[in-house]
Regions:
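Extreme N-terminal starter segment of soluble prokaryotic enzymes
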Residues: 1-4
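Short glycine-rich anion-binding loops that position phosphate/pyrophosphate groups of nucleotides
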Residues: 9-11, 75-78, 101-103
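Short catalytic helix/loop segments, enriched in acidic residues and glycine
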Residues: 20-38
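Short beta->alpha junction loops
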Residues: 44-54
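Short, glycine-/small-residue-rich phosphate/pyrophosphate-handling segment
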Residues: 47, 105-154
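Short acidic/histidine-rich motifs immediately flanking catalytic phosphotransfer sites
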Residues: 63-70
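Short Gly/Thr/Asp-enriched flexible loops that form oxyanion-binding sites at enzyme active sites
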Residues: 81-90
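Short, acidic/small-residue loops that bind anionic groups at enzyme active sites
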Residues: 89-106
Length: 154
């Protein structure tokens, strides 16, 4: 099983706290954490980050036949990118959205999540663990007949 871990704008600059590890983790550390977790789960990964909407769409469009699932952290594009939503809907590969923080606790305009309508599952506000929870859930979805109901964790 292989997943595309697709990260949107500014994820490459953010920093997170990792449970049990003092200090902060940068993007490279975050992706190392995700990679190690996926390795333990027996999931291959193709990790990509872009600050450009078109590049994210190109990755989504090239997913069929290349990966079995998409784990998407759309960053700010979550709130207005109908183009990414359309790419997800046109793509035959199931996708799960990860939001590292809780947008409802931020500015009012972040309460709308357009991209979520193209995803089968949503993991919101879990920090780095959200990636692994999303991968586990997506793997379970793919191991069933794929007809599982949408899943939201907040």
């Amino acid at each position: 099983m292989k997943f595309l871990i697709l990260n949107g704008p500014n994820i490459n600059l953010a920093r997170w706290s990792e449970p049990g590890v003092p200090g902060e983790v940068d993007y490279t550390g975050l992706m190392d954490y995700v990679q190690a977790g996926c390795d333990q789960l027996g999931i291959e990964t193709d990790i990509c980050q872009s600050n450009h909407e078109g590049d994210l769409i190109d990755e989504i469009q090239s997913a069929p036949g290349r990966v079995d699932g998409i784990v998407l952290t759309p960053g700010g594009y979550a709130h207005y990118s109908v183009a990414i939503l359309d790419a997800l809907r046109l793509c035959s590969v199931p996708a799960v959205e990860v939001m590292l923080d809780a947008p409802d606790e931020r500015e009012p305009f972040r309460k709308t999540d357009v991209v979520s309508f193209g995803c089968q599952g949503h993991f919101i506000g879990e920090g780095p663990q959200g990636y692994l929870h999303a991968c586990i859930w997506l793997a379970q979805l793919l191991r069933t007949d794929g007809s599982s109901k949408a899943h939201i964790v907040m």
